[in-house]
């Protein structure tokens, strides 16, 4: 069978110029020009993998699941456990009740049980996946219909793509210890570490994020997020914007919007909330802690 590698351009399936070790390959795949190797992976049907350096599963892979991150309180002990079925309601619940030790342990126990139940024994690439011009994929689960083009590194990630709502990972992106939900796109040099990206989100144009969560239909470009809880429909479009230690939803960040979670000399221990529908104007600076009402 021939594989369509780009619109109107077909190549016959097969394996050419590639080193594979302990790999299961599905039907009608085209794998060629693998610079280093593919090691210990499961590959589905009708995949196109070309000009990729390394695809590998190593010992201790988590695929981004069970990772505890500190959202809002950057210096905290961790209040959200990231896993593939996380949603904004559960994440907010974990943050709100992080001081309730018994409840926190119960939630973590339930999530750990789910992670153990659903964790694959090695990295896998689903069916109808396209991976081209990519440097490194390690300990990652890439589900059906995903397209990865020109990425630099995916490490300990789960990409929850499906054929009806595919995920696109674009050029120069680095994604580590993170989960990306269906319909999302991570493009143009975006950098994610210890993050959860919900459905139909776009992170692009060099946006960098660490220990943050983004939920449905959020758009982030150029700026930076750290320990941020970005609920549905948040938008930030400017290079000079920093979202740190804040809880947002239906929020629009103006250019040069900045937040400070260092009050006095105690370190980054402060945080605040902008309730739904908030908008910050250009040059806004907020010193946490604060709570700002809706709209």
Across the structure, where does each feature detected by a protein language model lie?
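Terminal amphipathic alpha-helical/low-complexity segments used for targeting or macromolecular assembly
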Residues: 1-122, 127-128, 295
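Left-handed beta-helix
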Residues: 16, 21-22, 26-27, 32-33, ...
């Amino acid at each position: 069978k021939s594989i369509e590698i780009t619109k109107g351009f077909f190549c016959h399936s097969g394996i050419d110029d590639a080193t594979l070790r302990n790999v299961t390959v599905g039907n009608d795949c085209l794998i060629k020009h693998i610079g280093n190797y593919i090691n210990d992976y499961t590959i589905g049907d009708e995949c196109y993998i070309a000009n990729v350096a390394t695809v590998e599963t190593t010992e201790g892979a988590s695929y981004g699941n069970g990772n505890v991150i500190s959202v809002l309180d950057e210096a905290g002990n961790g209040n959200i456990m990231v896993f593939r079925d996380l949603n904004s309601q559960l994440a907010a619940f974990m943050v709100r009740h992080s001081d309730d030790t018994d409840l926190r342990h119960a939630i973590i126990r339930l999530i750990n049980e789910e992670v153990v139940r659903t964790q694959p024994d090695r990295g896998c690439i689903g069916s109808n996946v396209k991976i081209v011009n990519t440097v490194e994929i390690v300990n990652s689960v890439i589900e059906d219909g995903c397209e990865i083009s020109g990425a630099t590194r995916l490490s300990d990630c789960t990409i929850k793509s499906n054929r009806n709502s595919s995920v696109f990972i674009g050029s120069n992106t680095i994604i580590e210890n993170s989960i990306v939900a269906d319909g999302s796109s991570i493009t143009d040099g975006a950098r994610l570490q210890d993050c959860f990206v919900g459905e139909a989100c776009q992170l692009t144009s060099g946006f960098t994020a660490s220990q943050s969560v983004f939920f449905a239909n959020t758009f982030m470009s150029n700026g930076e997020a750290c320990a941020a809880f970005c609920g549905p429909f948040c938008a930030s479009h400017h290079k000079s914007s920093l979202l740190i230690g804040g809880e947002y939803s239906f929020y629009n960040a103006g250019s040069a919007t900045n937040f400070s979670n260092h009050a006095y000399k105690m370190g980054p221990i402060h945080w605040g909330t902008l309730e739904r529908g908030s908008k910050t104007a250009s040059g806004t600076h907020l010193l946490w802690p604060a709570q700002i009402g809706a709209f």
